């Protein structure tokens, strides 16, 4: 059984834990030890192993700093979800270790769309950049779910400071940049592990949890132009320039 994302790995994985069914997870932001799926990252111990999405937050902020040298501080902006919370904690830990190129200021984690908008606008006047994480579990004042692209459209139309993100999907949405924690790479590695289990009869309990290599540095040309950021002298550090913004209805949707 292959399980993608924290919710599936936690809730379904734990139902299969200790059975004869091999389980491979991927796209897990939280530490796998937290969910009780593995006893050790190097030697999981039972029938579950997989791919840990450890993130390239520092690399994303490094790229932002190189594109916007005057940036000194940033805030985190995210919905309050099972997926977002581990990302927030990882960035907080990096900030406490003082290994980030920008100083972490405020942390905005909410599922209220009005609260999200108000705090984002207020905070954008006090910091130089945002780190935008997942924003797909917000609700309006009436309790109705607000689509991620609707949130993204509001953000791109109202926030005038640069942002980093952690996955390519957000750059294709319209956010400025990422050092991509590639979902494709995670899925590929997960299927490699599953193949070893099925064809080579490798014991998942002896297969170390893996973290895939960083994906490409992506920058959104449209957002850069909107913010007045020139990419002309920075192309050597960019792997891929994106010229679409799904949240604004520009280009193909992903």
Residue ranges, per PLM feature:
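Short hydrophobic alpha-helices and adjacent helix-cap/hinge residues
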Residues: 1-254
């Amino acid at each position: 059984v292959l399980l993608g994302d924290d919710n599936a790995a936690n809730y379904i994985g734990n139902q299969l834990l200790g059975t004869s069914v091999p389980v491979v997870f991927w796209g897990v932001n939280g530490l796998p030890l937290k969910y009780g799926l593995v006893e050790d990252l190097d030697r999981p111990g039972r029938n579950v192993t997989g791919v840990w999405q450890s993130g390239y937050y520092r690399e994303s902020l490094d790229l932002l700093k190189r594109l916007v040298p005057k940036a000194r501080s940033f805030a985190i902006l995210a919905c309050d979800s099972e997926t977002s919370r581990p990302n927030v904690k990882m960035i907080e830990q990096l900030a406490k270790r003082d290994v980030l190129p920008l100083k972490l200021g405020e942390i905005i984690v909410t599922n209220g769309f009005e609260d999200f908008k108000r705090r984002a606008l207020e905070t954008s006047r006090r910091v130089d950049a945002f780190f935008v994480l997942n924003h797909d579990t917000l609700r309006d004042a009436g309790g109705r779910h607000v689509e991620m692209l609707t949130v993204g459209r509001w953000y791109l139309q109202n926030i005038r400071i640069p942002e980093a993100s952690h996955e390519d999907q957000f750059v294709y949405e319209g956010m400025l940049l990422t050092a991509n924690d590639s979902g494709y790479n995670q899925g590929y590695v997960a299927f490699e592990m599953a193949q070893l289990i099925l064809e080579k009869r490798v014991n998942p309990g002896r297969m170390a949890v893996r973290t895939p290599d960083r994906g490409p540095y992506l920058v959104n040309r449209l957002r850069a132009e909107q913010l007045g950021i020139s990419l002309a002298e920075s192309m050597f550090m960019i792997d891929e320039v994106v010229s679409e913004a799904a949240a604004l209805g520009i280009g193909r949707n992903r």
